């Protein structure tokens, strides 16, 4: 099932299915090392409107909730 990154529980491993949004969003996430097909670990999803902290390719990346909501993922067991 494909859901938004903001809907996933902390500690979950997910695969990036696709990225919603325009070229600017896709380029920004690409510069941060986030691409469709990548496996990322959701380390912390801030309560309410806080940032989302993920680990991708061994690097910690903090994302605003608006950008995190544009990342559609599949939860990996």
Q: Language model features by range: what are they?
A:
Residues 1-77:
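Compact, glycine-rich, soluble single-domain proteins
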């Amino acid at each position: 099932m494909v859901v938004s990154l903001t809907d996933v529980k902390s500690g979950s491993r997910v695969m990036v299915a696709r990225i919603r949004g325009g070229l600017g969003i896709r380029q920004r996430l690409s510069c941060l090392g986030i691409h469709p097909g990548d496996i990322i670990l959701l380390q912390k999803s801030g309560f309410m409107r806080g940032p989302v902290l993920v680990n991708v390719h061994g690097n910690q990346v903090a994302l605003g909730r608006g950008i995190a909501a544009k990342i559609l993922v599949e939860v990996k067991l």
